[in-house]
A protein has these predicted regions:
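Extended hydrophobic/Leu-rich segments
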Residues: 44-45, 73, 291
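Active-site-proximal alpha/beta segments of enzymes that process anionic O-linked groups
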Residues: 21-34, 52-268, 275-279
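Metal-dependent active-site segment of extracytoplasmic phospho-/sulfohydrolases and closely related
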Residues: 101, 279-300
Length: 300
C-alpha cells in the first residue's frame, strides 16, 4: 500500500530538518527537529538546541511473551502520542509555489513488485528517495489512508484511527492553512467499505471528490464497482489543477487497479496481477515523464 507514499510522508514532516530546494519555512525562522534513535539501549529523543532526553521506548530485548509484547506496544503508542510535526504559521512572501500529489496505491508491496518482475522498471528512475526496508503496519486500504492523512502526528492504535484526532494531526489541513488548495481523487467510486466516508470523517479530507464523469472503466472490482483508467484520472488532474488560479495545491489520489478480485468487464476471473502491475507502472512512468517535460513544479 505504501511504497509510493512513505517518502512523501518523511519529506513533508522533516522539512525543517533538511528542506527542499524551495523552503516552506519563513526566511530566517529557527528550526526545531526531533529525531528518534534506536539500538540495544532505550530509545533516545534528541532535540536540536537542547540536551538529549531519554525517550519512552524500551529496548526490544525481553523474551517475546504476550505480556512483554503488549507492554512494548503500549509504550510505543505512548511515545508516538508525543510526536508531532510543526508547520510554520505562514509562508514568506517570496516562497516558491509548487504542487503536491500524493499517490496512495492499494495492494502494492516490495514483494509484489519483485514477484511481478518490476524491480528494474524505468519508473524508478524518476524517484529521488526510496525506502525498501520497512513495515507499513497497515491492515487494509482504509486504515492505511487514514494513517497517511494523519501523518503530522505519531501512530495510534487501529481503534483510535476511528476516533477524532487533534486538528494539527491532519496533513492536508496543515497544508491548507499555508495556502494549498485541496484536491481529492480516486480511481474508483469510494463506496465499498465506506472508504470515501472514512477519508472524510477520519482523514479530514472534506474537499469534493474530483469529477469522474466519462472516465474510462478498465476493470471492475470484486463488488462490480468501476475501476477507472489511471492515465485518464491523472490527465484530468492535470487539466483541473492547470486551470486552478492557485498555483499551490495538495492532492490526495487513492487508486486500486491492483486490488485482489479486480476483473475485466465481461470476465469473471480475476485479472492477472503481473499484467495489471506492468500496465500501471508503464502509465505512471509515462505520466511522470510528461510531468517533467511540462516544467510544472510538482512533488509526487
Amino acid at each position: 500500500i505504501t511504497v509510493f507514499v512513505v517518502a512523501i510522508l518523511l519529506w513533508l514532516n522533516v522539512l525543517t530538518l533538511a528542506g527542499p530546494s524551495f523552503s516552506l519555512c519563513p526566511a530566517g525562522q529557527p528550526t526545531t527537529t526531533v529525531t528518534t534513535t534506536g539500538g540495544n539501549a532505550a530509545a533516545t529523543v534528541a532535540a536540536t538546541g537542547g540536551a538529549p532526553v531519554v525517550g519512552d521506548m524500551p529496548a526490544q530485548t525481553a523474551p517475546p511473551t504476550t505480556a512483554n509484547l503488549n507492554a512494548w506496544l503500549n509504550n510505543f503508542y505512548n511515545a508516538e502520542a508525543k510526536r508531532k510535526s510543526t508547520f510554520p504559521s505562514s509562508l514568506p512572501a517570496d516562497a516558491q509555489p509548487f504542487e503536491l500529489l500524493v499517490i496512495n496505491i492499494c495492494s502494492l508491496s516490495w514483494s509484489d513488485i519483485e514477484a511481478a518482475g518490476l524491480m528494474s522498471h524505468p519508473l524508478w528512475s524518476h524517484f529521488d528517495i526510496e525506502f525498501k526496508n520497512f513495515n507499513s503496519a497497515t491492515s487494509y486500504s482504509g486504515p492505511a489512508a487514514i494513517r497517511l492523512l494523519r501523518a503530522s502526528c505519531g501512530q495510534t492504535s487501529h481503534t483510535n484511527l476511528y476516533q477524532p484526532a487533534n486538528n494539527d494531526c491532519y496533513l492536508f489541513d496543515n497544508l491548507s492553512k499555508l495556502g494549498f488548495t485541496q484536491h481529492l481523487m480516486m480511481g474508483h467510486n469510494g463506496q465499498f467499505g465506506g472508504f470515501l466516508k472514512e477519508v472524510r470523517e477520519n482523514g479530514g479530507m472534506q474537499t469534493e471528490l474530483m469529477d469522474q464523469t466519462n472516465l474510462p472503466v478498465i476493470l471492475l472490482g470484486f463488488d462490480g464497482s468501476p475501476v477507472y483508467d489511471d492515465t485518464a484520472v491523472l490527465n484530468r488532474w492535470l487539466d483541473v489543477t492547470e486551470k486552478d488560479k492557485n498555483s499551490r495545491s495538495a492532492t490526495f489520489y487513492n487508486t486500486l487497479p491492483l486490488h485482489d478480485g479486480n476483473h475485466y468487464p465481461g470476465v469473471s476471473k480475476t485479472a492477472d496481477y503481473k499484467a495489471r502491475a506492468q500496465k500501471f507502472f508503464d502509465e505512471l512512468d509515462a505520466f511522470f515523464t510528461e510531468l517533467e517535460k511540462s516544467g510544472r513544479k510538482v512533488m509526487v
